[in-house]
Amino acid sequence: MQKLVAFWQLMRADRPIGTYLLAWPTIWALMIAGAGEPPLRIVVIFLLGTFVMRSAGCVINDFADRNYDGHVRRTRQRPIPAGRISATEAMIGFIALLAIAFGLVMQLNTETVMLSFFAAGVAALYPFCKRWTHLPQIVLGIAFSFGIPMAFTALESDQWFIAGLLFLANILWTVAYDTEYAMADREDDLKIGLQSTAILFGRFDRLAIGLLQLATLALLGWILHLITVELWVWLALAAIFLLFAYQHWLIRHREPGKCFQAFLHNHYIGMVFAIGLAVHYWF
C-alpha cells in the first residue's frame, strides 16, 4: 500500500494542476475542431490521455532529476529522493504509463497515432533539457501543446491555420506560466546548476512573462475573430487579461511562494477560455 501511495504521489495525481494545464488547451482544440460538438468517445479518450501522459511526464521528470531534487527545498520529499520509490521502479512505472497511453491513442486514426509518437518523445526529452539549455520551458510548451494538432487530426478537421495559432498561443502561455514556476525554484536551481527561463530572463523576468502573456492574448483574440464569435464572448478574453494582471500582482516581489501561487492560478486561464468557446458554440 505504501508503494501505491508513493507512486500516486510520483505521478502527481494528488496535485492535478499539471493535468488541468494539459487538458484545457486540448479541450479548446476539441471544441474548435468539432464545432462545439466533438464526439463524447473522443473527448473521453483525450481526457484520459492527458491524465496518463501528464503522469508519465512527472515520473520521467523525477527520474531525470533524482540526483537534484534532494537539494531543492520544494522537492526533497518527493518519492525518489525520499527513498520511497527506486529509480528502477520509476522507469517501470513510466513504461507502463506509456503503454496505457498507447492503448488509448490506438483507438484513434493513423495520423493521430503518428503524432502521439512525437508527443511522447518531446515529453521524455523535456526533463533532461534543464541541463543544457536555458529554454526548457519552450520544450515543455511544445510537449503541452501536442494535444492540439492531435485533436484536429482525430476529428479530421481542415482548420489548420487556426490549429497552428492555437498551438503557438499555448506554447507562449506555457513558457509564461512555467517561468513563474521556475521563479519559485530559481535560487536552488542556480546552486545546483540547472537552467531555466527564469534564470535567463533575470531581472527582466516579469517583463518577459508580460510580453508572453500579451502575445498569447493576441493569438487567442485572432482565433476568436476567425471563428466569428459574438461580441460578448470577447468578455472571456477580457477576463483572461485581468487574471494575468492578478498574476503580476502576485509575483511583483518575486517571493517563491507567491510565484508558485501565480503558476497555479493559470488553471483559471484555461477554464475561462474554454467557457468562452462553450458559450460561442452552445448558446
Swiss-Prot record:
Primary location group: membrane
Cofactors (names): Mg(2+)
PANTHER family assigned: 4-HYDROXYBENZOATE POLYPRENYLTRANSFERASE, MITOCHONDRIAL, PRENYLTRANSFERASES
Pathway field: Cofactor biosynthesis; ubiquinone biosynthesis
Organism: Idiomarina loihiensis (strain ATCC BAA-735 / DSM 15497 / L2-TR)
Gene: ubiA
Top-level taxon in the UniProt lineage: Bacteria
InterPro entries: HB_polyprenyltransferase-like (IPR006370), Prenyltransferase (IPR039653), UbiA_prenyltransferase (IPR000537), UbiA_prenylTrfase_CS (IPR030470), UbiA_sf (IPR044878)
UniProt KW Membrane keyword: yes
GO biological process: ubiquinone biosynthetic process
CDD domains: PT_UbiA_COQ2 (cd13959)
GO CC terms in record: plasma membrane
Protein name stated in the entry: 4-hydroxybenzoate octaprenyltransferase
Keywords per UniProt: Cell inner membrane, Cell membrane, Magnesium, Membrane, Transferase, Transmembrane, Transmembrane helix, Ubiquinone biosynthesis
Catalytic activity: all-trans-octaprenyl diphosphate + 4-hydroxybenzoate = 4-hydroxy-3-(all-trans-octaprenyl)benzoate + diphosphate
